[in-house]
Amino acid sequence: MNLPEQGEAAKRVLCGANSYIEKYFFNPRFQNLPEEVQESLQKIAVVYTEEIGGIFILQFDEDGKLDMASIKEDDDFLYDPIGAELKRKQIFKDYKELFSKLEEYYAGLLKIEKEKSKS
């Protein structure tokens, strides 16, 4: 899987963390989210990469549903694919309400952006 670097796919990325370079990214497109939400997202992404390794991306799919992607480099033999799937399921369970609200927020954001582009 390639990281979305530009275009529509990149605009759908909410946040991500990279264990290889120890960096966290938050998409400025979503800067109007409350600080508490931004902090929760950072915690989710950073803890995931600390426990599992690799690169973690939280993004909206084409239907506006929140999805997670986990990517590893070819030579990363410490990456835990089984743990990655278990952690992914745990995150969806633990943050179900937050993710539902984020999907609503994203739908509203798309609607506003669409209306702005018409005028």
Regions of interest found by a model, annotated:
Residues 1-51:
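Negatively charged, low-complexity tracts enriched in Asp/Glu with abundant Ser/Thr
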Residues 33-37, 95, 99, 115:
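Short, structured coil/loop segments at alpha-helix boundaries
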Residues 112-119:
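Short linear, low-complexity motifs centered on an aromatic residue
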Residues 48-107:
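Amphipathic protein-protein interaction modules
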